[in-house]
Regions:
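Conserved ankyrin/ankyrin-like repeat signature
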Residues: 52, 84-85, 117-118, 150-151, ...
Length: 197
């Protein structure tokens, strides 16, 4: 047992002796000085602790709890490509499209770090395909800028808009071209042609 925890527990015992009242836990109040670390769904997901995420939610942990960046467990599971945690969070009632401080959803972030399977799972369970972040960027624009053809194709298959533009006026093709990803440009143009025919 570490010194901080020992001191805390000793303090509870001393308070009981001084006041004659039982410790707060015995009265139904759960005091845990380490709760910010151990009982935070977002942090457990960030650290890829699937068992901890499951346990926290099963014991009443809020699945959409946010950290200082406004990110939830779903954001971190998407970034990490942790399909198990995504599934646990979905089962626990977590939102699919929460926005963090910059307006990014889990789908934005999964696309940004090339987590193909996380993108596909989020799309399959009904994540919004075209949300804008604070810069007006959609997951398709982000995937296009990263050059990930597989993610671009997955987004297009779910109906991602190729005509939406961000605050600079660039669309997904513009981002792919500027980032020198000709394969992405071709994939988007093929999808546009297929829609027209």
């Amino acid at each position: 047992m570490n010194a901080r925890r020992t001191a805390f527990l000793g303090g509870l015992a001393l308070a009981t002796v001084i006041t004659g009242s039982p410790a707060p836990r015995a009265q139904g109040i759960q005091i845990n000085p380490f709760s910010q670390y151990y009982e935070n769904v977002a942090r457990a997901a960030k650290q890829n602790q699937a068992g901890q995420v499951r346990s926290l939610i099963a014991n009443g942990g809020y699945p959409d709890q946010t950290d200082d960046e406004g990110r939830t467990g779903m954001h971190y599971a998407a970034i990490n490509g942790n399909l198990q945690i995504i599934a646990i969070l979905i089962k626990g009632g977590a939102k699919l499209d929460p926005k963090e401080k910059l307006g990014n959803t889990p789908l934005h972030l999964a696309a940004d770090v090339n987590q193909v399977e996380a993108v596909k799972l989020l799309l399959d369970v009904g994540a919004a395909v075209d949300p804008d972040n604070k810069n007006g960027m959609t997951p398709l624009m982000i995937a296009a800028s990263r050059g990930n053809v597989e993610i671009v194709q997955a987004l297009l298959a779910k109906g991602a808009s190729v005509t939406k533009t961000d605050y600079t006026g660039r669309d997904a093709v513009g981002w792919a071209a500027e980032s020198r990803h000709p394969a992405v440009v071709q994939a988007i143009k093929r999808a546009q042609s297929a829609k027209k025919s």
